[in-house]
Amino acid sequence: MDLIAPIDAVFLLAESREHPMHVGSLQLFEAPEDAGPDFARQTYEKLLSCKDIDATFRKRPATLFGAPRMAWTTEDDVELEYHVRRQAVPRPGGTDQLVELASSLHSALLDRHRPLWEIHLIEGLADGRFAVYSKMHHALIDGVSAQRLIQRTLTSEPAGEARVPWNLPRTPRTPATDSSAGLLGAARNLLSAAASGPTLLRTARAVLLEQQLTMPFEAPRTMFNVPIGGARRTVVRSWPLERIKQVKKATGATVNDVVLTMSAGALRSYLAERDALPDKPLIAMVPMSLRSPDDVATDGVKVGAVLCNLGTDVADPLDRLQVVGESMRKSKDVYSSLSSIQTMALSALMVSPIALSLLPGLVPLTNPAFNIVISNVPGPREPMYWNGARLDATYPMSIPFDGQAVNITLTTNGDNLDFGVVGCRRSVPELPRLLDHLENALSELESAAV
């Protein structure tokens, strides 16, 4: 029986009906041209035939006399028929019905009496495609690592071997055990590091003040920064990467700058149509890789985060892009000039509000540390396949928190950027409007720049 790391345990202790603590992913697949009508069923049966289950997918929280213990126990007899399920979307079988089903699945808690993961193969789409919704508890694996794990089940060849996440060959850096890969994974490591020396946080504060960077808890309060309920709504859409690149080329910005500005314009319009746009600009928490290209296989804390001024108080889209770009460049320049101890301290200070937001009742008592998390997760740039089916889209589905009622996560998939926006149904009404505003924001940037 292995003890659960203290920071991982927070995700179990803080979980409630209102606060599910799992990450998800929705993938869309196009069946092979020669596939018969039973292709989805046959794929499901192939999944169930993979009985060799990795240790990570056998772990569940231990109990003592019915009470939870902060330790993992290993399930010897994993019932795959429970964890791997077959679903069908209701008529008329469109994308809206698929995403609504995924939203419902994403709202439901994982059963702690079993290993903390589920995979749902979803059929019944009117266009003949099928989907896979996966979810895994954040105490087990962080969001970026889960995304990478799912990507490893894919192949670049249509005839490639069909692989499943619970039975993958080990690599020198296995995503299932790489807890430093994502933003919340960074919270695990960075908060532990910060706890080892109070001088780290003093160092971080000194760096922020000296460089005049945005400090945590300086963001305005918005309708997103409130306590949330348990019901989730997810909306998804894909945009051609070439459209973003055209704006990048015309303005000298980065792809991430354009994506952040696109998101900023959408948030500005969404809040403005509800008379809820604050005078001060919204602040986004943006995960940032601190790993150089030549140390991919190195362990340790290599993910930080920056606070980005989204310029939502600026009406002109190009001026807003300049604000976002300057904010991101300044933060990156500061990180590049820091020592390792300063980098660790600054990252800990930036990420720590994520863990603090898990504490019940804290949100109404403090100003928001930031208004929203916007994550850009690298994905495959070439066409990918699973059991011969072509991957059409991958929509990340992250975790809203108290004080963070909406989350925007996107990933690269071939020539597209796939956006997954997850929000609290109660706190963020008419979430699909945010997709319309994202399109309008990109169109405004194109009109002004290209």
Predicted regions and their residues:
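Soluble acyl-CoA-dependent acyltransferase catalytic core bearing the H(X)4D motif
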Residues: 1-7, 26-39, 44-404, 408-450
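Generic start-of-chain signal for non-secretory N-termini
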Residues: 1-22
